[in-house]
Regions:
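Catalytic machinery of carbohydrate-active enzymes
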Residues: 1-300
């Protein structure tokens, strides 16, 4: 059966959050599904081992300059989707645009959130209610990223990962300045950790200037010989490294979502993002700023 799932939210975190719902649809119909996602979801880089997903189709929308933007872009997207002859589509949004695109693409069975109800939608509860109402399935919010054992073993060998050490992922990056904890906090944690344990630290961050400053400060500390930076490694190649870690301590960043989905116990340092992004998985353990009872946008 040819099934399309539309998940048009931005970023790795949102892509990870929707994995249990994609899996539920695939299992229901005993068939891998195809997903329509944005390029910045990085789905192609970390879902190539996912047995529930067949084709990853990129939705090219880029601030009105993408090939799928506007009226002409919608026509192009219709042509692109028609080639697959999809029988069903599950649309995880309330957009009339995607509803019409699906109809003009020749898809007979269209399942979608109620139209024009985007405001105040809870990212997880809305998806859970949608799958319950359409497929009568209760979906737990516990994403899982699949990796081949040979990749995990290869990373362990190549990076000299020793089970006698405590291997710790430090997700020091973040998409915004208020999401990033200063380097000194990570250094203080490292000092406390090595007092009692033999530790190795894997530094996960992006390549923008502010993130690189944090990494540089850590690599200039007295703990530099215990650190392995991952910023020059492709995202898909970091996954088996993360899988070999016993614990992750991350800002609210893509790596907190990835590590939790890889089954690593993940402490999430929350600042100004809604708390649900740091506690939706049982593998996530959020820490919020002193004096706060919760966090949301603009907490700091």
């Amino acid at each position: 059966m040819k099934i399309l799932v539309v998940q048009n939210r931005m970023g790795i975190g949102d892509m990870v959050i929707f994995l249990p719902f994609i899996e539920a649809i695939s299992k229901k119909y005993n068939s891998p599904v195809n997903i329509l996602v944005k390029a910045n979801s990085k789905a192609s880089e970390f879902l190539d081992n996912n047995k529930y997903i067949n084709n990853i189709i990129i939705l090219d929308r880029d601030n009105k300059s993408g090939s799928h933007d506007g009226l002409l872009g919608s026509i192009k997207l219709i042509k692109d989707l028609k080639k697959f002859n999809f029988e069903k589509v599950f649309i995880f949004n309330s957009s009339l645009r995607f509803n019409l695109i699906s109809k003009f693409s020749g898809i007979k069975e269209i399942y979608q959130y109620p139209l024009f109800t985007k405001k105040n939608q809870h990212i997880i509860k809305t998806a859970q209610n949608f799958i319950k109402s359409q497929l009568d399935i209760n979906v737990e919010s516990q994403p899982f990223i699949q990796l081949e054992n040979k990749l995990i073993d290869s990373a362990k060998k190549n990076f000299k990962i020793d089970n006698n050490e405590i291997n710790i992922l430090l997700g020091i990056g973040g998409s915004g300045s208020t999401k990033r904890v200063p380097a000194k906090k990570y250094i203080e944690f490292m000092e406390m950790a090595i007092k009692n344990y033999n530790c190795k630290f894997f530094l996960a961050t992006g390549k923008n200037e502010e993130e690189q400053v944090i990494q540089k400060q850590i690599l200039q500390s007295i703990h530099k010989d215990r650190c392995i930076p991952l910023d020059q490694i492709k995202l898909k190649d970091t996954l088996p490294i993360i899988k070999n870690c016993q614990i992750a301590i991350c800002n609210d960043s893509s790596f907190s979502h990835l590590s939790a989905a890889l089954g690593v116990e993940t402490i999430v340092l929350m600042t100004d993002t809604p708390l649900l992004y740091g506690n939706y998985s049982p593998k996530m353990h959020p820490i919020i700023p002193d004096g706060e009872t919760t966090v949301t946008h603009n907490t700091l």
